Every structure is written in structure tokens, then in C-alpha cells.
Amino acid sequence: MAAATTVTLLLLAGRYGYHRDELYFLLAGRHLDWGYVDQGPLVPALARLLDTIAPGNLVVLRTPSAVLAGGAVLLVAAIARELGAGRGGQLFAAVLAALSGIVLASGHLLSTTTVDLLVWLVAAWCAVRLLRTGDSRWALGIGLALGVGMLSKLLPALLAVGLVAGVLIAGPRRLLRDRWVLAAAGITVLLAAPNLIWQAANGFPQLGVAASISDGDSSYSGRRDAFTLQFVIISPYAVPIWIAGLIALLRRPEWRAYRAVGWAWVVVVGIVLIAGGKGYYDAPLLLVLTAAGALVTVAWASRGSLWWRRGLLALGVVPFLLPNVVLLLPVLPADRLPGFVVDVNYDAGETIGWPEFADSVARVHRGLPPEERSRAVVLTANYGEAGALARYGPARDLPRAYSGHNSMVDFGRPPADADVVIAVGWVGGEPGDPLGAWFERCTLSGVVDQRVEVDNDENGGPIHVCRGLRRPWSQIWDTEVRHTG
């Protein structure tokens, strides 16, 4: 099942186009550092390596994600086995994981989420083995996984908090004084040190990004969306299964040793909901609960001769599991993508139309008088737009694109004499309009036409030409143009 997941993802890896985050990773990879405003160095470095090996090849860029997704499926089955599942329970857990929203969505794209998924599951598997065997040396595996994960994002620290809280609540509390556990904590800090030092030296900008996410300024964020996502991120079909797994972990006498894992999810999801984080942050632990629930469900379906139980499980696969494939993978034609797909899967729309986006900007650039065209620059509202123009702009003779979004602000600001600016994605003429504050005059000169009917963040967006910079770039770049989210 793990191999089938990886192969399927690889077969579909070249469909549609780059995701905005992938374009950002590729651009960040040209500016390698030990940390960034919104992430660690791991994924940008990986993106640079893969694009160096095979420039412009989406399949190569996404191969690690497909492999990690297959690894996640294998780990879910392995966790079910640790809990005592037989072959049937392990297979059922693997199927639920393979068709889950979090595995399919993160396995299709190069993403920090894919790294998080595997890191959390490796740590969870080691935690379950530690609790089952009592051998605290397995804590070293937890420390190693969390440390590597924190080179991608600081999010694995949330799992560490959940596991420590789970042990405090359910025991065994002696683990918190164990030398191997303390050594594991040291490994985590040592591996994470480059990113942590960078964050500390720059005022922990990831906390600012987290605040923007909490305010709902990012996809899948905010308390309401985070709560709703709990019921669909694996699949609606899996909800009663992972709930059964949670109850069993917290109440089964024979699973007393594993109660800390159940409490870890309760603590983590509580923090996510209170803080307004993204609703998929706790998804790896939901897969752990699903592994436990698979064992409980298979036992329930096998009890006695009640054939309807097995029939009920089988009938639910088509309406509740298989739609994930259509909604989360690029199996439908991009030019005829139904609106409901983008409504459910925001990321699908963000992988369509980037070359056409660059064409739209190029048309505005070509329309400038020659003397302005030679000194014009592009200012984008977000990192996806800047990444797309870095990828597709040179072939269209476009000037360099700048942006103040997240770490883009640190990659450079426009030259001091850049007073003709093609502003992409900025809404002008409204109260609080930044373009009006920065420039003497701005003219709407075009709109983004991605040549497909898709409701994403860019299609139909405005393109202004602005002239007459009111204040030097050096005065406004870090204070006004800079923004996170």
C-alpha cells in the first residue's frame, strides 16, 4: 500500500504546474540561509538541489514528497502493529492513511507539511515503541526526528509539548528524568540550533507569521477552519474510527501504557484551536489515532457473524474515501476544473496558470514607453507571484520582481532610482491603499488572465503601473512594504 501510494503520486506529479509555495522555495533556494521568516533552511535547500539536478522538472521536484508520503503510510501501519493489530488491522490502517487528505495533499507537492508529516509519525512510532517496551533508548529516535523537523519549521516543538504533557498526565513520569530522554532533548536542540539561532538573531519572525495565521490571514487558518478541518483532513469516513481509537487509547486497560499518546493529541489540538493555528497541524497525530481505531474497528467488524458490519465498512469506501483522490490530486483537466474542487482544495487552484500569469505581467511591461521599460521593476503582493516571475519572467524579458512578503523582503529591494513600478496584486484606490501612499500616481493597466475559469488568488487580479516614488525605497521597504502571512 505504501508503494502504491508513492507510485500513484509520482505518476501524477507532473500534472498542472508549480504551487505558489514551490515557486517560493525555489526562489528561497537561491538565497540560502540558516533560517527564513516563515521556515527553516531544509526545504529551500532541498528545492535548490532538486532543481539543480533537473531544472524545471516537476516530477523530480516532487519525488521526495511522494516517497515521504509512502513512508507515512508505512509508519501508520507500523504503529497499528505496535498496538497489536494483525495483518487485517495493519492493512486497514494503511488504506485509511493512503487515502487520507493529509497524505495525498502533502504527498503531491514539495512542502514543509510533508516533512512535518513524516517527522511527527517517526516520533510517534518511536514513542509507542518506547511505551510498549519500556526501553527509553527509543527516545533518541524521537529527538532525532524532532531535530530534523525543526530545520523545516518550528512546529515539531508542538509535538514535543504534547508528548511531555501526555506523560505528565498519564505517565510514566519517570521518563522525564531518564538519561536517554534528556539526551534526546539535547539532540533535538543541537540539530535545531542553526534555525533557532537564526530566529533568535532576527527576533523570531516565525512568531509574527504565526500571529498572522491566527488572525486568519492564511489558508486553512483561524479557529473555525481549524476545528472543521479535524473532521475532513483524514476523511469523514475516518472520523468515527479515529474517535474510537482515541477512546480506546484513553480507556482500554490493556492500552494503559499508551495513554500519553492519546493525551498528546488532546493537548496539541487544544493548543491549535486556542491559538488559531492551521487545522492540519495535528493531522499526523490524527493518523496515530486512526491506526489505533483501525485495530478497534477490525475487531468490531470481525465479531460474531454480523456480516452487515463488514458491509458497512466496505460501502463507506466509495462515497467517503475515494473522493479524496479526485479532490486532492490532479486527475481532472486543469481547464475544466470544477469550482467545488477549488472550494474544497484551495491548493489545487494555486497550481494552475502561473505561465499565463507571467504573460499578463509581460503584456503590461511591453506596453510601457521604451524609456520607462528599461528602468521598470515589478513589485508583487505575495511570494507566489514573485516566485512565478523569477521562474517564467526571464523568458518574457521581464525585469526582476521584488516583494515584501515574508522572507522575500530580505532578498533585496528595488534600486534607489526605480520610479516606474509594475505593481501586481495590489488593490489600488481604496482606503488604506499602500500604492497611493508610496507613489504619486498609479494607473490600472491590466488584469491577470490565466485563461482558465478558476477561482484562485491571482486570476483577475489587478496590475497597476505606478510612477513617482514619494519616499526612497530605503525608508519604506522594511517598515511598510514588509508584511507576513
Residue ranges and their predicted role:
Residues 63-84, 122:
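Transmembrane-helix motifs of polytopic, lipid-linked glycan transferases
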Residues 76-99, 118:
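Transmembrane-helix signature of polytopic, membrane-embedded enzymes
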Residues 102, 108-115:
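Short acidic/glycine- and proline-prone juxtamembrane loop motifs at membrane-interface regions
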Residues 160-258:
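Transmembrane-lumen/periplasm boundary regions of multi-pass, lipid-linked membrane glycan transferases
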